Amino acid sequence: KNRPTFCNLLPETGRCNALIPAFYYNSHLHKCQKFNYGGCGGNANNFKTIDECQRTCAAKYGRSS
């Protein structure tokens, strides 16, 4: 199973001006990081919690443990 492709997207604040704490997966650093979401628009690399981000994007895909 492969990591979802949206995990590679850069964080997008979106069109609105709210400052909602959110998390995105940084594919270069291989970890989830905080960013401010504007409240609308953006892309799928946007999670309400760091746990949700890690479960979706930071899990070990395609590697044997």
UniProtKB/Swiss-Prot annotation:
The residues that cross the membrane are none
Q: Does the keyword Secreted apply?
A: yes
Its subcellular locations are: Secreted
Q: Which cysteine-cysteine pairs are annotated as disulfide bonds in the entry?
A: C7-C57, C16-C40, C32-C53
The entry's note on the tissues where this protein occurs is: Expressed by the venom gland.
* Record key words, sorted: Disulfide bond, Ion channel impairing toxin, Potassium channel impairing toxin, Protease inhibitor, Secreted, Serine protease inhibitor, Toxin, Voltage-gated potassium channel impairing toxin
Instruction: Site Reactive bond for chymotrypsin: give positions.
Output: N17, A18
List the GO cellular component terms.
extracellular space
- CDD domains reported in the protein's UniProt record: Kunitz_textilinin-like
Q: Which domain of life is it from?
A: Eukaryota
PANTHER family in the cross-refs? BPTI_KUNITZ INHIBITOR DOMAIN-CONTAINING PROTEIN, KUNITZ-TYPE PROTEASE INHIBITOR-RELATED
Additional observations: Negative results: does not show inhibitory effect on trypsin.
Q: What is this protein called?
A: Kunitz-type serine protease inhibitor IX
What are the leading ranks of the lineage? Eukaryota, Metazoa, Chordata, Craniata, Vertebrata
